[in-house]
Design a protein with these regions (language model features):
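Short, basic interhelical loop/turn and adjoining N-cap
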Residues: 41-55
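Long, charge-rich, low-complexity intrinsically disordered regions
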Residues: 1-2, 109
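DNA major-groove recognition helix of helix-turn-helix
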Residues: 30, 54-61, 65
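Short, Lys/Arg-enriched N-terminal segment that forms or immediately precedes the first helix
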Residues: 2-14
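Short, amphipathic alpha-helical "recognition" segments used to contact nucleic acids or chromatin
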Residues: 15-34
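Amphipathic alpha-helical protein-protein interaction segments
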Residues: 74-109
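Short Lys/Arg-enriched helix C-cap and helix-to-coil transition segments
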Residues: 61-79
């Protein structure tokens, strides 16, 4: 913005992130196990956008924002499971029951 004396003034609004940037931010924050509402706040979603995002995460398999959220959480779930399996294979008495539960989950499919 330029004032009447042609000097620049700072913009009062920040540029909004691109759709890809927003999806990446959501995925990264979800991977850090942030709540849906916290992610909405950190990405400057309006209250209406927040409600839509919360609804999408709970009810939509096709919404790109919901997919990014689920994908981020699943990456963390994968990392945690890998650690548990690694510790179980090394004889950890705390990790072995968890690894057994993971095996039972997969038998149901």
């Amino acid at each position: 913005m330029i004032t009447s004396d042609n000097s620049p003034t700072p913009s009062t609004t920040l540029p909004s992130p691109s759709a890809d940037d927003l999806l990446t931010q959501i995925e990264e924050m979800a991977a850090a196990l942030m709540t849906v509402r916290d992610i909405a706040l950190l990405t400057d979603m309006s209250s209406e956008e927040t409600d839509t995002f919360v609804y999408a995460v709970k009810n939509s398999l096709d919404n790109p924002l919901a997919k990014a959220y689920r994908k981020g959480r699943l990456w963390t779930k994968l990392a945690l499971r890998r650690k548990v399996v690694d510790f179980a294979l090394k004889g950890s008495p705390a990790a072995q029951p968890l690894a057994d539960e993971y095996l039972k989950e997969n038998e149901l499919l």
